[in-house]
């Protein structure tokens, strides 16, 4: 479960460097790894069972998760959000609207009033069990939404390393021996432990999974979508309209530039979404695939827009975010891939579960093309 690095200092950008750093800043971190020692992930129980980073090539391999080293070193919480980073974190929705848990009752929907609940920002999850390939966490929470409804819930979060056969079966592929890969799955559950039902009157929560990944000049997010569905292909006005040179769609695939040079966000509705989103970093030749639960026929997704909403259940199923300078400041060189569960319409004692899987592939371009064609319908050469 715990891994040691080589005696020589590791280079920044490698998994070994991040492991050494996190062993100092994050007591109790866990390392899951496969039998070869090449595929590894780091998990922090102190940060909600967050997957901090991963690698496909051992300690000297590329580290895929974005980390906020300065903030992690101090371990200080900050107003609004403590942006520690991490490759996959557990959040709850909705962010905005009358059912929001990020704004207090009666407040204006402005950044000054926006606050991530401490339970999903800086508090620890309880470690239930851990092996070389899986770790299980739990947390009791009490949150209040914008209309004043108190919501009590129990959270279960299981993190599992995926093997080659898991990935072959999941994606319907046959991985070449020349391809290095790391993949993990999180099973995230919320149970209504209160005395009132979660519904359209009292409000509902959703499970919201977000991945912070290292951006580059040549990274492109790609998302397939249903071409025959009704409604806009995507929502792109979260932070103002995304320029055409940064966002386009063609032949059933959305292309969204992820260079951390322009703050922007897109969302895809459940009627348009498919259960995949990913990215390709042409500089490092890394293909990333995220696969998640997308229940057919369920169109009730919480709406995260910062306003009182006409329809608080008309939100997105999948999102992508590109960081950039905002008011002269920037969080870091990262982008995000996000998925959400449907709105949790739960009577007391009932549970909703959402799975999210992240897989990184490195190898010869012809092998990456085979994976990309199978999942996204296009070769990696077109992801630009």
For each of these PLM feature ranges, what is it?
Residues 2-4:
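C-terminal motif of bacterial Sec signal peptides marking the signal peptidase cleavage site
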Residues 6-185, 189, 193-253, 257-384:
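Surface-exposed acidic/polar loop and edge beta-strand patches at domain peripheries
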